[in-house]
């Protein structure tokens, strides 16, 4: 214990200050139609470009991988284009951001709740600082959503990505109660839990 306490361990710092630390596992959830993907893309663009969003600022550009599980490629292109223009970000600063979206893949999107699906994503993780997974429902398809056991393989992978120095932001749907949909065990390893609320709703 004395050896551990005397170790020089660097502070984590932030990818997006003051809300998104380096080496963090976070979840952002909201009801359908509130703007989860818009918020997630805004965060990813800010981190990749070293820009700012929602009064949060990225100290420096970081390599970002955005994995989209459901959006048509044309819709994603339109959203990203509008977002980049609206944030006044020069397109060349987005060289740090990579995108995987279903329409442009030669096969179905991998199931990240399986070891095989995780292995398919691995080649894209080299030198990546942040991974955004949008969303749990479409990218984690094995098992029952309400059973904690079905989350164990995904949980182990997320912890491994964090051990390797990555920040992971998961996007998810809210259930009828307003909490994140499915097993509460998902929150057990989350460092950051955020919810998007509609206008006039501060929940």
What residues fall within each predicted segment?
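N-terminal pre-Walker A segment at the start of P-loop NTPase domains
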Residues: 1-15
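Conserved inter-motif catalytic segment of the P-loop NTP-binding fold
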Residues: 10, 16, 32, 59-145
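Conserved RecA-like P-loop NTPase ATPase core
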Residues: 20, 44, 66, 134, ...
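Pre-Walker A (Motif I) flank of P-loop NTPase domains
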Residues: 22-26, 62
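Phosphate-binding/switch region of NTP-binding enzymes
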Residues: 27-28, 33, 38, 130, ...
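Hydrophobic positions on the alpha1 helix immediately C-terminal to the Walker A/P-loop
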Residues: 39, 43
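Surface-exposed alpha-helical segments enriched in charged/polar residues
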Residues: 45, 49, 81, 122-126, ...
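Post-Walker A helix-loop "phosphate-sensing" segment adjacent to the P-loop in P-loop NTPases
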Residues: 46-61
């Amino acid at each position: 214990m004395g050896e551990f306490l005397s170790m020089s361990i660097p502070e984590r710092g932030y990818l997006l200050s003051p809300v998104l630390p380096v080496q963090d596992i976070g979840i952002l959830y909201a009801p359908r139609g509130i703007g989860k993907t818009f918020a997630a893309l805004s965060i990813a663009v800010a981190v990749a470009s070293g820009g700012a969003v929602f009064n949060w600022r990225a100290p420096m550009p970081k390599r970002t991988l955005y994995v989209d599980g459901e959006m048509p490629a044309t819709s994603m292109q339109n959203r990203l284009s509008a977002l980049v223009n609206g944030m006044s970000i020069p397109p060349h600063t987005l060289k740090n951001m990579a995108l995987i979206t279903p329409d442009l893949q030669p096969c179905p999107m991998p199931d990240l709740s399986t070891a095989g699906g995780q292995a398919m994503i691995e080649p894209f993780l080299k030198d990546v600082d942040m991974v955004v997974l949008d969303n749990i429902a479409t990218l984690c398809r094995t098992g029952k959503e309400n059973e904690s056991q079905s989350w164990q393989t995904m949980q182990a992978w997320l912890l491994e990505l964090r051990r390797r120095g990555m920040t992971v932001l998961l996007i998810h749907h809210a259930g009828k109660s307003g909490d994140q949909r499915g097993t509460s065990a998902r929150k057990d390893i989350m460092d950051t839990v955020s919810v998007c609320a509609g206008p006039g709703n501060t929940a």
